[in-house]
Swiss-Prot record:
Protein name stated in the entry: Eisosome protein SEG2
Lineage per the UniProt record: Eukaryota, Fungi, Dikarya, Ascomycota, Saccharomycotina
Residue stretches of biased makeup (Acidic residues): 550-561, 595-644
Region of interest (Disordered), residue spans: 76-142, 171-225, 404-429, 510-938, 961-993
Compartment(s): Cell membrane
Biased composition (Low complexity): 761-773, 850-860
Organism field: Saccharomyces cerevisiae (strain ATCC 204508 / S288c)
Top-level taxon of the source organism: Eukaryota
Miscellaneous notes: Present with 538 molecules/cell in log phase SD medium.
Residues the record lists as Phosphoserine modifications: 137, 280, 504, 507, 556, 980, 1022
Family the UniProt entry places it in: Belongs to the SEG1 family.
Function statement: Likely plays only a minor role in eisosome assembly.
Transmembrane segments: none
Membrane topology annotation: Peripheral membrane protein
Length: 1132
């Protein structure tokens, strides 16, 4: 017995495989299907005893059977089994074997991984047809031996193994047994027909689907044991073991609907309900409705199966509808919930945004309120400061210094530290005023204005008595320290400012007395007038500074009150000045005297200029020293004043500092010159400032133009100066500005030159003007014009030389060895005429002069292959070898140049052959006699050429046709009749400029014993041809070659490159070629070329001398090319 696979075993293995978990190690018992037979526990104890006694033996025997691979060993080792030769077995032994088989199957499945149903698989209809029982020989006990299958785990699942068992005779009646045998394989058990029908239908469908797969897999040698189990075996098992289940509980099998769902969703496993009720998987009412009572006995199994399937389909459809409805409801609920959540999120976001916006609005409102309050405070402070500034300015101008006499020389007064921080104009004026004050004080009651710095005073009057004591009288209307500290830009207190002013004045009076000069008594009146002028100028200057700042503040505030405040400030200009006569100017008439004050300012400025010139002339050395020490004093003063900042400094000093920075231009001269020039410039700038302010109060542009010496012209028109001052200023300004002007004038000039030199056409550049010559452009233009004219005009001497060089390649000079070559051909080819006299009319029409394509011709050694001519084109091909073809009246020619040179330069006559002059007519009979030109005496109208041309052509055609019919072609002739390895170019009528000539340097072979040497004719284009090789080979007519070969005459080609026109040979239909460039390019095909006698000598018409020369050279000269042919073709 040989083990083989069975569909039942595969079905079981598939069931277990489906029940396996994902890891493949454990089996889900709920997923194992229930098979179609249900058993109850057996009550007989004898059968149970027999079953359990044989359990151990069956296990050991089955394992040994698997190990040895032979089923027959099982029967030999079992003592209860009879001989294999007997075919009769007892019923008891068969029953015991069946019990063992069931127990072995159960234990095997348990060992494999889980429980298995105890129901026996039914055989499908395909395998159940062969239901013949397997019986063996009867044993001594009368029992029969049968074989059953055991399922053993294998590499692909469970493997079925057939084991022989003893079958006991049935205990039931024969009628019952016959009824069961007559039934189908799908017959229902006796207990419950309905349930067994469903079980069988389901399991048969599974087994039948997998049976087809298993049958193709493993077939054994004996197909009889692997196809089916007998009906006898099935019925006996049903009868004997109907009540012996292997598993105590039953499992409900899957319905058809569940099976379809499993097919749709194979990964979803639905557990089966296991219960003790056998019919729990389906309601009996369904079966009662599906099967009518009257038809229960008459319906077949197939009909019942169909009805059940229809019912299951309906149920499945209903369940699908219900599930779809439920899914839709769930989806709607989920959507509603998601929408609700989104709405909540949106609401929360909106609420948060509203809160943020509210907070931002509140913050903005608070900031706006704070800003409004700040603006109000700033405006109020500005107003207060503006009023206080006016009062302080008016009070400062009313300060007087009392000096009783001039007898006591007092130290010269030097302006305080803060004055040096002011512009240089104020310092110079202050020094001059102090000199005047010290000299012009005659009376003790004389009150003079003390030029104390505006920023160092804080609304208090300083009075200097005769003892030089300083008293500080507080004013009731003066500002207090607390009021000043309220403003953001003002620091310090009133008392501090007063103390600072006092100490600064005292220190300056005691320390700086060197730079002042005391004038003589004679000049007292003059000094008094100047002092008055200076006082008024100083006051005007201070008033100007205060008025300027006030106007700027008023304009920035854009308040209507500013228009009312400016007139009140004009009262500051009216200062009470007390001279020695006691005359006092009224302070209240300021608005009425504005114009007078302006005129006084101009006059005072002129006087100041005169005075300054005198002082500078006298004290030049002292001023040099003072000017050199100005920077050191300024640094010290800055350090001292950084600690105290007066409110008036903020108002009045800052614009002056800006003015000083703008007008402070460095000088390139000696310090001594610089001191004098700076003083003049300072005077000039002050005058210009006063003039600009009087015209437009707050025009900063005009002010800057007047302050900057580079923006203003130093002419007398701008400043009202005296002639002396104009001359002195113009000289000093020119000396001071000239180096700068020279320096600045050089740099822009260099830039302009560089910039212009970047342009190619620039000729004004100082750098590139020498190199950029106009001759270059002219020579370039001449070159272009010459190139253009040369391309279109007639050829010059240079082009002639180029043409001569190109033509020399086309007409090379031949070696003298090849000039001596002779040609011998057969006697029958004495006279060869070219066919076709119909083209004679075309001779006189087209005349082409030589070397027409020499300019575009390729090199001499280039080669171009072509195919041999056909028989139809052979005549025209041979005619083209004799004479060049004439170009037809076609516009498609690409090789004719536009201009053909008619002569060659005489200087090149030694290197190149001289070309004949152009013919006046195409009917000339003779040409100039030249040794190196062929066909020199031939003409187009010679009688010998045209005589009997048609008759001879016809005769040659007849002879050639007869030879072709006779087939007399020697081996050597057809060898040379094939296309030669030498390249050629065929002549066609479409190629208008083709001229073929013999150029192959082949001579007679040296071995004269070979009588069958063949001529190889090659073609070459003349110098008119562009792109063909000079060495071109043409195939011959095979019949003509055979004629030439059978005559026994030797001949070969010639290869003299210098006298190509003298090399004309005919063989077969030998083509005659010429390189005479003077001939026209088209000749009639009927023109005979040469006459060859019986001895093989060539006689040319009108060229006997050349023939004699060729004959003399034939004996001596041999071509190297012929030697190469010997090597190629094996000639000896």
């Amino acid at each position: 017995m040989i083990q083989e696979s069975s569909p039942d075993a595969l079905a079981a293995a598939a069931a277990i495989g489906n029940a396996l978990s994902y890891n493949g190690r454990t089996v889900d018992k709920s997923k194992i299907p229930q098979y179609n037979q249900s058993f109850t526990s057996r009550t007989t104890s004898i059968a149970g005893i027999n079953r359990y006694t044989m359990l151990s033996n069956s296990r050991t025997n089955s394992r040994m059977l698997l190990m040895n691979g032979n089923v027959r060993q099982y029967s030999k080792r079992t003592s209860s089994l009879p001989n294999q030769g007997h075919k009769n077995t007892s019923n008891n032994s068969a029953g015991r074997r069946q019990h063992r088989a069931h127990e072995d199957a159960e234990t095997t499945f348990r060992e494999f991984g889980g429980k298995q149903s105890s129901k026996v698989l039914n055989i499908s209809s395909s395998t159940g047809q062969n239901s013949k029982s397997r019986t063996t020989s009867l044993g001594n006990s009368g029992s029969t031996i049968r074989t059953i299958k055991k399922y053993i785990p294998g590499p692909r699942g469970l493997m079925a193994v057939e084991v022989p068992v003893e079958v006991e005779p049935p205990r039931y009646s024969l009628s019952n047994r016959s009824n069961q045998r007559g039934g189908r394989a799908y017959s229902l058990p006796t207990r419950n027909n309905k349930t067994s029908l469903m079980h069988r239908n389901k399991t048969t469908k599974k087994a039948g689907s997998q049976e087809k797969k298993s049958e193709s897999g493993g077939k054994s040698k004996n197909d009889y044991h692997g196809k089916v189990l007998s009906k006898m075996h099935t019925t006996s098992l049903k009868q004997r073991h109907n009540n012996v289940p292997l598993i105590p509980t039953t499992m409900n099998e899957e319905t058809e609907q569940e099976l379809q769902e499993d097919l749709h969703d194979p990964l979803e496993f639905k557990p089966m309900i296991i219960s003790d009720d056998e019919n729990s998987f389906i309601e009996p009412s369904v079966l009662d409705r599906s099967i009518p009572k009257k038809d229960k006995s008459g319906l077949s199994g197939r009909e019942k199966k169909e009805e059940i399937e229809t019912l299951l389909k309906e149920v499945h459809s209903l369940e699908e509808k219900i599930s779809n409805i439920e899914i839709a409801k769930l989806n709607e609920e989920e959507r509603e919930q998601s929408l609700i959540l989104e709405l909540r999120k949106v609401k929360l976001d909106e609420e948060r945004r509203m809160e943020l916006l509210k907070r931002e609005l509140n913050i903005v409102k608070e900031n706006a309120d704070l800003e409004a309050q700040e603006l109000k405070l700033i405006e109020s402070k500005r107003k207060q400061h503006f009023h206080k500034g006016q009062e302080v300015a008016s009070e400062v101008k009313s300060i007087t210094i009392r000096q009783p006499t001039l007898s006591e020389p007092k130290p010269a007064y030097v302006p305080p530290e803060d004055v040096e921080k002011e512009p240089s104009t104020l310092s110079n004026q202050t020094q001059n005023i102090e000199n005047a004050e010290n000299i012009d004080s005659v009376d003790a009651e004389g009150n003079l204005v003390d030029p104390i710095l505006l920023g160092s005073l804080n609304n208090s009057n300083f009075h200097m008595n005769s003892d030089n004591e300083v008293r500080c009288i507080a004013d009731s209307n003066s500002l207090t320290g607390s009021e000043l500290s309220d403003y953001n830009y003002i620091e310090g207190s009133a008392t501090d400012l007063r103390a600072t002013a006092k100490t600064s004045v005292e220190s300056e009076i005691g320390g700086n007395q060197v730079g002042l000069k005391i004038p003589q008594d004679d000049d007292s009146e003059k000094q008094e007038e100047r002092t008055k002028g200076k006082k008024s100028g100083l006051v005007d200057t201070n008033c100007f500074l205060v008025q300027k700042e006030d106007q700027e503040e008023a304009l920035s505030d854009n308040e209507p009150e500013s228009s009312e405040k400016f007139p009140s400030t004009s009262g500051i200009e009216n200062v009470k000045l007390e001279d020695e006569t006691g005359s006092v100017m009224d302070k209240n008439n300021g608005p009425n005297n504005d114009k007078d004050d302006d005129d006084d300012k101009d006059n005072d400025n002129d006087d100041d200029d005169d005075k300054d010139d005198d002082v500078n002339d006298d004290d030049k050395d002292e001023n040099v020293d003072d000017d050199e020490n100005v920077d050191d004093d300024d640094d010290d003063d800055d350090d001292d004043d950084d600690e105290y900042h007066d409110s008036y400094d903020v108002i009045m000093r800052d614009p002056v500092q800006i003015e000083q920075d703008i007008s402070d231009v460095p000088s390139l001269k000696h310090p001594s010159e610089y001191s004098t020039e700076t003083e003049d410039n300072k005077k000039k700038e002050q005058n210009s400032e006063n003039a600009e302010v009087s015209q437009s109060g707050t025009n900063m542009a005009k002010y800057l133009r007047g302050a900057n010496p580079y923006l203003t012209n130093t002419s007398s028109d701008t400043f009202s100066l005296d002639s002396e001052n104009v001359n002195s200023k113009s000289s000093t300004d020119t000396t001071r500005v000239a180096p700068d002007l020279l320096k600045s004038s050089l740099q822009p000039q260099l830039r302009s030159d560089l910039k212009q030199s970047a342009v190619p056409s620039s000729t004004s550049s100082s750098i590139y003007s020498i190199e950029t010559s106009p001759n270059i452009d002219s020579s370039t233009g001449k070159t272009a014009s010459n190139t253009k004219t040369n391309s279109h005009g007639p050829p010059t001497s240079i082009s002639k030389q180029k043409y001569d060089q190109s033509s020399s390649h086309q007409i090379p000079v031949m070696s003298p060895k090849r000039l001596d070559d002779k040609r011998k051909i057969t006697n029958r080819s004495c006279l060869r005429t070219l066919r076709g006299s119909s083209n004679e009319a075309t001779l006189s029409h087209n005349i082409v002069y030589p070397a027409s394509d020499s300019s575009s011709s390729p090199p001499y050694h280039s080669k171009k292959p072509s195919n041999p001519p056909s028989s139809g084109n052979l005549a025209s091909h041979e005619a083209s070898k004799c004479f060049p073809k004439a170009p037809q009246a076609s516009t498609t020619s690409r090789r004719l140049p536009d201009h053909v040179p008619l002569y060659i330069d005489k200087n090149n006559s030694a290197l190149y052959p001289k070309e004949p002059p152009a013919r006046k007519s195409s009917f000339e009979k003779e040409r100039p006699a030249k040794d190196n030109l062929g066909f020199r005496s031939m003409s187009l109208r010679e009688p010998l050429i045209t005589k009997n041309a048609t008759a001879t052509a016809a005769e040659n055609l007849d002879v050639e046709e007869k030879k072709e019919k006779g087939g007399h072609v020697s081996r050597k002739s057809w060898t040379f009749g094939l296309p030669s390895p030498l390249k050629r170019r065929t002549s066609h009528s479409t190629h208008t400029t083709n001229e073929t000539e013999i150029v192959n340097p082949m001579t007679n072979f040296k071995n004269k014993t070979n009588e069958n040497d063949m001529p190889i004719l090659a073609n070459k284009k003349s110098c008119n041809n562009d792109d063909s090789s000079p060495y071109t080979a043409s195939s011959m007519n095979t019949n003509d070659v055979s004629e030439a070969g059978t005559e026994g005459h030797r001949f070969s080609l010639f290869g003299n490159k210098s006298q190509l026109s003298n090399r004309n040979i005919s063989g077969g239909t030998a083509t005659l070629e010429s390189s005479n460039p003077d001939l026209p390019t088209a000749l009639p095909l009927s023109v005979p070329v040469t006459i060859i006698d019986k001895n093989g000598e060539i006689h040319k018409l009108h060229n006997d001398d050349a023939a004699i020369k060729d004959k003399s050279h034939d004996r001596h000269g041999h071509s190297k090319f012929g030697r190469k042919l010997k090597k190629i073709f094996g000639r000896k």
